Amino acid sequence: MITKELEQNMRKSVEAAQRNFNTIRTGRANTSLLDRLTVEYYGADTPLKSLATISTPDSQTISIQPFDLSSLVLIEKSIAMSDLGFTPNNDGKIIRINIPPLTEERRKEFCKLASKYAEEGKVALRNIRRDAIERIKKSEKESEISEDQSRDEQDNVQKLTDRFITEIEKNLSDKEQEILKV
């Protein structure tokens, strides 16, 4: 009945949680750390990746080469003012960010942040489940489907929810292992 749409919505919630996980630092240089960074460029907040080429020449360095050299200082300022905790090094053509090794305390903070993102994803899944079950009950109330069909549909919704929650928990476990690996 509504399984296809429901599955798509739940998949989007899992993907959103995964995107959040990708923004968490692990001690290795990763371009996704800068995915959410915006730069005020000609009066508009512009995503960094549309202003520069971002690469990782080695496991401890992120390199940012702007398409327009006049934006170099703006990019540097944006990185320095962000909550990422990076200190950009500007050599006039390229900005380099050295990724320091994580302290044990920072690793624990990042694990807590990952848990928070996972919980947000699970809450989103539960909200989608609640809405779907309400629609099923409404259909049953209006005699569009039988009580047995309603129960079967609700069971299917619950199984789908459980499957996606398990997927988020697995992604969280993988991310925590990645964060805690020294």
From Swiss-Prot:
One example GO MF annotation: ribosomal large subunit binding
Ranges for region Disordered: 137-158
Keyword annotations from UniProtKB, A to Z: Cytoplasm, Protein biosynthesis
CDD domains: RRF (cd00520)
Keyword Protein biosynthesis: yes
A GO BP entry: translational termination
Subcellular location(s) per record: Cytoplasm
A Pfam family assignment: RRF
GO CC term (a single one): cytoplasm
HAMAP family recorded: RRF
Family: Belongs to the RRF family.
PANTHER family: MITOCHONDRIAL RIBOSOME RECYCLING FACTOR PSEUDO 1, RIBOSOME RECYCLING FACTOR
Described purpose of this protein according to its UniProt entry: Responsible for the release of ribosomes from messenger RNA at the termination of protein biosynthesis. May increase the efficiency of translation by recycling ribosomes from one round of translation to another.
This protein's name: Ribosome-recycling factor
Taxonomy of the source species: Bacteria, Bacillati, Cyanobacteriota, Cyanophyceae, Synechococcales
